[in-house]
């Protein structure tokens, strides 16, 4: 192999390793068997959530994972692999790929990494069932508002009972 090709591959390994280090979550899938139309729709959905989706050779993924400190992730790089990287939303790639796999049986989630820790297929699927960041914030807000709402209702009830007594 020529030195130019080796240098190009080494550069690609470095780029992928940096993406792995910077990613909030990584999901590895086997997309073998997807039609071109399905793949286009999937890529559009992922792009809409600012998730980068690439098909990369396993040898490059293994070397990049090793360089990024995710050596255990190398076990999922078997057969054709596509990788979804998200730098912002931890849940988005798992949720989109899981929902898409329900309609496209050819898409299979293999595993991934969450906040720099290797995650199994089951952990990625569990992550996909969580609400997104906005949903979690709304849940937190409703939990925080409940005591205040209860106090306000109690004060209102006391005020009404004093009005009725007067």
UniProtKB/Swiss-Prot annotation:
Alphabetized GO MF terms: large ribosomal subunit rRNA binding; structural constituent of ribosome
GO biological process: translation
A GO cellular component annotation in the UniProt record: large ribosomal subunit
Name of the molecule in the record: Large ribosomal subunit protein uL10
Disulfide bonding pattern of the chain: none
Family assignment from sequence similarity: Belongs to the universal ribosomal protein uL10 family.
Organism the protein comes from: Streptococcus pneumoniae serotype 19F (strain G54)
Highest taxon above the source species: Bacteria
Assembly notes: Part of the ribosomal stalk of the 50S ribosomal subunit. The N-terminus interacts with L11 and the large rRNA to form the base of the stalk. The C-terminus forms an elongated spine to which L12 dimers bind in a sequential fashion forming a multimeric L10(L12)X complex.
Function comment: Forms part of the ribosomal stalk, playing a central role in the interaction of the ribosome with GTP-bound translation factors.
A UniProt-annotated Pfam family: Ribosomal_L10
InterPro entries assigned to the protein according to its UniProt record, in alphabetical order: Ribosomal_uL10, Ribosomal_uL10-like_sf, Ribosomal_uL10_bac, Ribosomal_uL10_bac_type, Ribosomal_uL10_CS_bac
